[in-house]
Amino acid sequence: MKHGFARTMGFLMAAVLLLAMVLPAQAATTGKSGLFSYTLKGNGTASITGFDWSQYRDNENIFIPQMIDGYTVTEIGPSAFARGKGTLDTRFQDKTYFAKVIIPETVRKVDEKAFFNSGIGYFTIPASVKTIGTAAFCTGTLRSTTVDNNNENYASIDGSLYSKKDKELLALAVETTSIPNGIISIGEYSCINGLIELTKVKFPSSIEIIKNYAFNGIDSYGDGTIRFDHVKSVGDYAFASLRESGVTIYFGSTLSEIGRNAFSGARLKALHLEQCTKVTQIPWAAFADFSASEKTRLPSSITEIGGMAFANTLIHEFAFDHMKPITIGSRAFEETGGVLDVDDNFFSRVESIGEYAFRGACFTLNRNVHDIKDVITLPSSCTFIGKGAFDSKWTAFKVQPGSYAEEWAQENGYEYDNGTKAKADTSWLN
């Protein structure tokens, strides 16, 4: 037993000594030199992970070192130079938009959001850079990028940054007045630039994809028209939170997919979607808190209206001509702040209506009044109606005898008509 105890204690002491040797090595994997913070990678090279903006002199050029504390710099890490949160933040513009960042030839990778919202105006990118992450150079005030002509993967045209392989716009610069024909994708966050009036930028007919957050939160649209006649998909939050503008946006018949919150909070002059007959779904909050000066007509192909799709929207600015949705999500039209202009067949194919879907909404059913109860016909295909789906102040129902809708109306105390008349009691005549 004594020998076993001694052997165990020996193992424990060896483990403690080993930890004592390892811990200092681990602590040395991060460091700081001047304004730069860095982390050592497994191959013994360094990744820049942070920058001390509190010690930065306004509009001074930033030279990223080739070597830092004796280690070769091969990477600029995620959000290493990023500032603030969210989308465009004008607090940083006047301090950095004349500054230039020179990336050394040792760097092979610039990670996602590396310079996001930093306000930096100019970049020099060497041929050595093989990988650029999402929104890496979306600074909010990008003036120009210069990419070495020998770079195999990336290019700069009129100051804007592009991926050669993906034929994608990665960052739009203020010098750019047109995107070259052949570009098929507008990258995430790529057009967020507070120095640009986007209506003065010509987008080619070759564009097929608008990725997430591509135009999110822009307040420099100006007045004019932007056409995306051949776009097939619009990503999540792609046009969300656009500020007050006089812009009109057109989409053509090729559009088949609209992302979540795609136009939520946007303020436009007009949005044209009437030709988009391949679109079958309005996803979550796609038009929540949306506003346009002219009425937006949606295609008749829509079969699914997602949750919060039009919540808190001035709904009279939309036309639902001949639309026959099958599924209406929870809170889809909640507190729409106007009269919902639908035709008499709007509910003719509906199968499911989510909770609070029409709370606070009222209908015209092709009548220009809403001070009387509108009679909504619920078909026998309807097998689910969520809690508080309708505001009883404005609605009464026509239902099929023995249907789910009739049972629901009875249980919830709604006024309804099932098309039958009660048989008169004649027993007293006997």
PLM region spans:
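Consensus positions within tandem repeat domains that build extended binding/scaffold surfaces
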Residues: 78-80, 112-114, 134-136, 188-189, ...
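Sec-dependent signal peptide cleavage junction
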Residues: 19-32
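Non-globular, low-complexity intrinsically disordered regions
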Residues: 49-50
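Bacterial N-terminal signal peptides
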Residues: 11-20
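Structural signature of tandem-repeat unit edges
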Residues: 35, 39-45, 57-74, 86-109, ...
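Bacterial N-terminal signal peptides that target proteins for export
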Residues: 1-12
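C-terminal cell-surface addressing/anchoring modules of secreted/extracellular proteins
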Residues: 427-430
